[in-house]
Design a protein with these regions (language model features):
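Short beta-strand motif characteristic of blades in beta-propeller domains
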Residues: 60-64
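Short Pro-Cys-Gly-centered "Cys-loop" motif that presents a nucleophilic cysteine in a tight turn
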Residues: 1-52, 65-255
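Short Gly/Ser/Thr- and Asp/Glu-enriched loop/turn motifs at secondary-structure junctions
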Residues: 55-59
């Protein structure tokens, strides 16, 4: 297991995704719970400060500052607490998150500004929204200084104030602004946004939550996969929604 690279600035872009690119937020109740646990995990006495964040359907982007050891403790608390909640609520078992979270050190103001924009533009690039004004990110906190937004207030000066912040975010940044390829976290543009795919899947399954498909008896699981394919979902979308491996989905759909 490789040793994490420390940042002189103490700031890191942290990314965590569902195991097998599985959906980790089924609805807004899940998202609210995650943000509650997130704020508790990065409380004042944790030694870790949350700067920016964004929740996608199958992964999370966080920009945080602190010592690596403190970050590891906070991330372990966040991931384990949320996974226990999610598994209980959705009657599933097994790992929710894929291995260790990824972290990229941030060293310069230019890199910091680019990463903040990258995090806030994730929903826009993925087709979840038509701008950065997305309810499950810190974009609004920067503008309104919500939730004791001292870090956001100070960082607005990096953009020349609120108007500069809006202008900087109004244009989609190129790949050079990204610390990790979009494709690695499934955040690229898709023909059917994940939120739409989730609704289609629920309708096709007739009351079975997509995340529960992987734990169904094999015959019922296979039939569910077939219904999802017939509903127009791609192999990759079915993999993410159900947690069933891509190879199994492809085999069942005859791809």
């Amino acid at each position: 297991m490789g040793k994490r690279k420390g940042a002189r600035s103490g700031i890191y872009h942290v990314m965590s995704r569902g195991s097998g690119k599985q959906i980790i937020f089924e609805d807004n109740a899940d998202r609210r719970h995650y943000t509650d646990v997130m704020r508790a995990s990065f409380s004042a006495d944790s030694g870790v400060t949350l700067i920016a964040w964004c929740l996608m359907d199958n992964h999370v982007h966080l920009l945080i500052s602190g010592e690596l050891a403190d970050i590891a403790i906070s991330m372990r608390l966040l991931s384990s607490s949320y996974a226990m909640y999610f598994n209980k609520r959705h009657a599933r078992v097994g790992h929710l998150f894929q291995g260790r979270y990824k972290s990229v050190p941030i060293e310069t103001d230019a890199q910091l500004a680019a990463v903040i924009r990258y995090i806030h533009q994730n929903p826009w690039k993925a087709g979840y929204s038509t701008s950065c004004d997305y309810p499950w990110s810190s974009y609004g906190e920067f503008l309104h200084c919500a939730d004791d937004g001292a870090p956001a207030t100070e960082l607005l000066e990096l953009f020349g104030g609120a108007e500069g912040f809006r202008e900087f975010h109004a244009h989609l940044g190129g790949s050079q602004a990204c610390t990790t390829e979009d494709a690695e976290f499934g955040s690229g543009h898709r023909a059917m946004p994940a939120s739409v795919a989730l609704d289609v899947a629920r309708a096709a399954l007739g009351g079975i939550e997509p995340g529960a498909v992987s734990s169904l008896p094999r015959a019922k699981r296979d039939a569910s996969i077939s219904r999802l394919g017939a509903a127009g979902l791609s192999v990759r979308q079915i993999e993410r929604l159900t947690g069933v491996s891509k190879s199994t989905v492809a085999r069942l759909l005859g791809h």
